[in-house]
């Protein structure tokens, strides 16, 4: 009794982002009940823009287009565009038809851009002023229009034809005399992006220059929108998550709880198949050296650690390089420098761990002469080779315009399995005269 009223009071004190986080951990039936309470507040639009797409599709099944139009009328146009992109096409079109013409045209303008470009991320709600205005007049306009713009930290100065001319921060505006014209106090060296700039590059620009928003211009350099830092934070998090998931062969969707078991299995299968192929080929190599293995059975005991050390250092190297490529800290002009540096790292670590394992083999299997030497050299060679392969593969894939995050993992693990086992037995055959 009174539970709904208490829940309503609690929701009114809760940020929509926190509501969305809790919402995703509820059952389907619980979500329906809680949303019915959320629907009694004016936070529905903010809440819908925060929740996961899979949950959004669950919720809208029970909502009418007329109700959704009322909700999105209070939302920012870029959030509306994102919402409509997530909905089934038929439902999205029905909602668009019911929208006010001016709002519909604004949203349609945003939806024409790819969602992973500056055009797809931008908000058309920005503060643009004519350069002929005085600082005093500009302050009055900002006060009158502050609720209309996405962010008032920056004021963008345009020519009469709408072309971007400069930028000035709100702080700088307040510090200048009210009679000074904007064109005389603005910063004309504006960092901007175009509507088709990839979201990765937009994120790089904002983080590189430590700005809160970046203006978006069209092919004629007309100011059409801004991308704000809050949107870019989401992009950076999503891109980093996607890269790490793809490196592990787990697809690019981190919402494993919202996907079916079969979907998760199918997503991971190709990467695991590549590892399986590498394991099978390594098995055939071991079988090929069956006679040598029978003569020195102790060789079998060290196969896992030799291959494991190679696989681990290859993963480290490839992860460092892939992340470096993504952040722009590693480029193709330094290809040989990067490869030789990681090769030296592999050589140092291979020497250290090869020495340790060689001593272990020497004292643990004293009856087999030179086994310690075989194991030590194998670890040294395999770790050096693995560090080189782990560095070389993502750089070459990048040069060939392949997605290094996706292709590196399977290729590297398969290569190390095959080359590591082969090198181990060839070294053993040579040093032990098998």
Regions found by a protein language model. Give the residues of each.
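Membrane-water interface of transmembrane alpha-helices in multipass transporters/channels
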Residues: 288-303, 365-377
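Soluble-to-membrane junctions at the N-terminal ends of transmembrane alpha-helices
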Residues: 255-274, 332-351, 375-376
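Juxtamembrane "helix exit" motif at the C-terminal ends of alpha-helical transmembrane segments
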Residues: 36, 276-293, 356-367
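Interfacial loop-to-transmembrane junctions
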Residues: 396-416
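Short helical (or helix-break) motifs at transmembrane helix termini and adjacent helical loops
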Residues: 243, 307-323, 413-421
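Alpha-helical transmembrane segments in multi-pass membrane proteins
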Residues: 16, 271-279, 283, 302, ...
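Hydrophobic packing positions in regular secondary-structure scaffolds
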Residues: 1-251
